[in-house]
Structures are given as C-alpha cells and as structure tokens.
C-alpha cells in the first residue's frame, strides 16, 4: 500500500516537471533607440518572437517638450504596420495595435514623426 502511494506521488511529480519544464516563455526583442526629427527618424531593427499584436515604446530622455508619434513596420513587408503610438515627457510609455497580423520570427523597425522640429528622444522599442 505504501509502495503504491510512493509510485503514484513520484509519477505525479515527474509528470508535473515534464509539463512545467518544457514550457519556454517567448518574448519580442527590446532595442534602445535615439531618434531626432527631422533627421534620424528610424529605430534599430528588432526581432519579434511573440504572437502579441501590439508594439511598445517608452521614452527615457526628451531634449524638449513635444510629442513623438511612432509606428512599427515589418522590415520585409512594409504593408504590415501598426497604428500610431504617441509619447511625450508627460506620457513616457505607449503601445499600439498592428493593422494586420504581425507574424513572429520576423524583423521590425520603428519610424517616427514629431509635433515640433528637432525633437530628440531616447528610449526603448519592442515590436
């Protein structure tokens, strides 16, 4: 009787470890950006490894007050784009949905425009 209980407990433990140990969390790559509008308006490229249909942008440094409008675009198929996410010194983080399915395993970049000239923003971008 005791042997049967131990076997059952061990089988349950092994099954739990197999299920829990085989799951791997999947994330999109996060890159730092430094853009100036007009001028250098593109972020570095970043790989998207998840299936979430939203991109994220966070500003960490603004050289002056203004709004930065950001859009995420698929590098190989520019028809795959996001809506605009806006950040400013008052609203440092934002996100926006993609208009169509943004597949994982591909590379994306962020393009920007601004409400004022010569706005320089540093921050992080996750496709």
Q: Language-model features: where?
A:
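N-terminal prepro-regions of secreted/extracellular proteins
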Residues: 1-48
């Amino acid at each position: 009787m005791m042997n049967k209980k131990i076997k059952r407990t061990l089988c349950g433990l092994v099954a739990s470890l197999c299920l829990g140990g085989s799951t791997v969390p999947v994330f999109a790559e996060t890159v730092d950006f430094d853009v100036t509008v007009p001028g250098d308006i593109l972020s570095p490229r970043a790989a998207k490894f998840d299936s979430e249909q939203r991109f994220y942008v966070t500003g960490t440094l603004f050289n002056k007050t203004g709004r930065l409008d950001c859009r995420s675009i698929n590098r190989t198929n520019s028809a795959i784009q996001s809506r605009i996410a806006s950040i400013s010194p008052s609203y440092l983080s934002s996100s926006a949905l993609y208009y169509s399915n943004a597949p994982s395993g591909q590379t994306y970049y962020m393009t920007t425009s601004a409400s004022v000239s010569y706005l320089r923003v540093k921050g992080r971008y996750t496709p």
